[in-house]
């Protein structure tokens, strides 16, 4: 957690330079660097091990943080899709396989989200891209797309 956005962005850039995912989000006036998403503690712990192998020791908080989202409609559908994809992408980033059925289910759920907001339409495209990343075993790319979506819909 950083008091300035510039400090947080510097850390996020360093993380991305090593091939990982990261995004900065303002929460309660401070800037937090998110470096991965997972549905369960075991998933984020496995992501943490990968960070440690790249000399990011002790930076991963491993905390479960909540983030409020603000969308024009269907907030519950957004949250459900992000949660499901965070699980699938963390599994893929950790070298585990994901079934085609799980990916198809996630894609179908995303396609059910309706919005007329242009920004949200672009974010829905990123969610579909994240599902495609998972399908192609590109877990960190999927994580980055999910973090970008979270940045776009988080309420400050």
List each model region and its residues:
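Weak global preference for isoleucine
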Residues: 1, 15, 27, 69, ...
């Amino acid at each position: 957690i950083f008091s300035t956005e510039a400090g947080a962005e510097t850390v996020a850039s360093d993380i991305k330079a090593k091939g990982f995912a990261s995004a900065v989000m303002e929460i309660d006036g401070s800037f937090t660097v998110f470096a991965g998403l997972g549905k369960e503690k075991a998933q984020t712990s496995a992501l943490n091990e990968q960070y440690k192998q790249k000399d990011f020791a002790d930076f991963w908080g491993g905390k479960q943080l909540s983030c409020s989202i603000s969308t024009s409609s269907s907030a519950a559908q957004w949250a459900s899709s992000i949660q499901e994809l965070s699980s699938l992408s963390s599994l893929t980033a950790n070298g585990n396989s994901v079934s085609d059925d799980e990916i198809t289910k996630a894609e179908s759920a995303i396609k059910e989200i309706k919005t007329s907001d242009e920004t949200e339409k672009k974010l829905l495209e990123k969610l579909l891209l994240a599902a495609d990343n998972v399908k192609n075993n590109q877990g960190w790319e999927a994580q980055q797309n999910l973090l970008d979506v979270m940045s776009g819909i988080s309420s400050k």
